[in-house]
Amino acid sequence: MDKREYIRRLAEFLMSTGTSMNVQELAGLLNWNGFKTNYDSPFKGGRGTYTLIHATYDWLVSSGKTTDADNVALAFKKPNGTYAYK
């Protein structure tokens, strides 16, 4: 499973349970599952993590999977509570 698919599935689970996750928690899960940034470094909950969320959202929209894209948009949040996909 690639990073985008992992994000999609995690977002689906979060939405099914009525919860969300902040970017730092997501970075920890990505690292724990062995995923790396495009620069082959661990995720830190910064720019690389936000880029992955946004890229996953765009990939799902372009694939016509709008429900999945909406899940990604709503599931992951910045520390201030705003949505991380923007």
Describe each region flagged by the PLM:
Residues 15-32, 36:
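Short, charged amphipathic recognition helices of the HTH superfamily
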Residues 1-4, 27-29:
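Short amphipathic alpha-helical segments, especially helix-boundary/capping motifs
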Residues 63-86:
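Phospho-regulated, low-complexity intrinsically disordered regions of nuclear gene-regulatory
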Residues 15, 27, 54-57, 61, ...:
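Residue-level detector of alpha-helical secondary structure
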Residues 31-67:
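Short, positively charged loop/turn segments that connect secondary-structure elements
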